[in-house]
A protein has these predicted regions:
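Long, amphipathic alpha-helical coiled-coil segments characteristic
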Residues: 11-61, 92-115
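Conserved catalytic segment of histidine kinase HATPase_c domains, centered on the N-box/ATP-lid region
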Residues: 87-91
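Short, well-ordered alpha-helical segments
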Residues: 39, 51, 55-58, 66-86, ...
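Alpha-helix N-cap/helix-start motif at coil-to-helix transitions, marked by capping-box chemistry
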Residues: 8, 32-34, 72-75
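Intrinsically disordered or compositionally simple regulatory linkers and C-terminal tails
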Residues: 1-5
């Protein structure tokens, strides 16, 4: 699997990412670090303990990382959840959260598949 194929699989914008990072080796380094980002874990923690502020900050960070890496599908889904939580008045909408979780899992799965294909 190529990095471009990985991006296609997750609904990302490979060309925008290359424009931002200037070359594939730099982009690859950051893509491979993405699964270790703690934003999704912190989002779940915030939900579990009922801390809407933590949930908001976590999904906002996830949205930003996804945007910087041009993971378009994940960024859009995280953005919708971010806006729902922005005013910190309610727990995350279950459908929005599910969409973020599915996109996140697909993204991490594709990155793992890409990494395995390089070994």
């Amino acid at each position: 699997m190529t990095l471009q194929e990985c991006y296609r699989q997750i609904g990302g914008d490979y060309n925008a990412a290359i424009d931002r990072f200037k070359n594939e080796s730099t982009l690859e380094r950051f893509v491979l670090m993405f699964p270790s980002d703690q934003s999704m874990s912190l989002l779940h923690t915030g939900i579990e303990i009922g801390n809407i502020s933590l949930s908001f900050r976590s999904v906002h960070s996830l949205k930003g990382v996804a945007a910087n890496l041009s993971f378009t599908d994940l960024q859009q889904k995280a953005s919708a959840l971010t806006e729902q939580l922005r005013y910190r008045s309610e727990q995350p909408d279950a459908e929005l959260l599910d969409a973020v979780e599915r996109s996140y899992k697909a993204t991490v799965g594709a990155i793992s598949e890409y990494k395995a294909s390089k070994a």
